[in-house]
């Protein structure tokens, strides 16, 4: 994949996702329930008023997809919905060694969600998809790859 832009901070992630998905009508996020679900809700926030249908699939549980809706408390998971979409956003927690999602089973589910045609976006930290070898298996259209630095201060 070739680099097309750089940015920093949380705004860099959110703005990139909003720009990449301008033409998307229905977006399904796929990630782990604990680690990735809050990121899906966060990434969905900037497109809350864009008229897009949003869903979240935990791990490989296609049949238990949840709608993501805007509420007075921000973006939240809601009732079950159809996972079919024109855009899939895969979240990096799936590639973490402790999670060990079978990438080939994930690829099959992505094909099922997209119905054979659509856009695949990866959103990850510290190049986890590349390090896990997923670039060779999943045909990402875009990758939002960010690094974090942590500073802890004490009085």
Describe the residue ranges of each PLM region:
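Residues at the starts of beta-strands that form the adenosine-phosphate
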Residues: 26, 53, 119
């Amino acid at each position: 994949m070739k680099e097309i832009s750089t940015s920093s901070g949380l705004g860099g992630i959110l703005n990139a996702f909003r720009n990449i998905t301008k033409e998307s009508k229905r977006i399904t996020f796929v990630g782990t329930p604990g680690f990735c679900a809050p990121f899906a809700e966060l990434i969905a926030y900037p497109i809350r008023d864009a008229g897009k249908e949003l869903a979240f699939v935990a791990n490989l549980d296609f049949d238990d997809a949840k709608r993501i809706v805007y509420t007075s408390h921000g973006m939240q998971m809601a009732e079950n919905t159809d996972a079919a979409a024109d855009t899939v956003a895969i979240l990096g927690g799936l590639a973490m060694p402790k999670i060990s999602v079978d990438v080939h089973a994930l690829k099959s589910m992505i094909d099922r969600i997209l119905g054979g045609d659509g856009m695949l976006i990866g959103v990850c930290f510290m190049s986890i998809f590349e390090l896990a070898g997923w670039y060779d298996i999943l045909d990402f259209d875009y990758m939002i790859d960010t690094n974090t630095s942590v500073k802890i201060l004490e009085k």
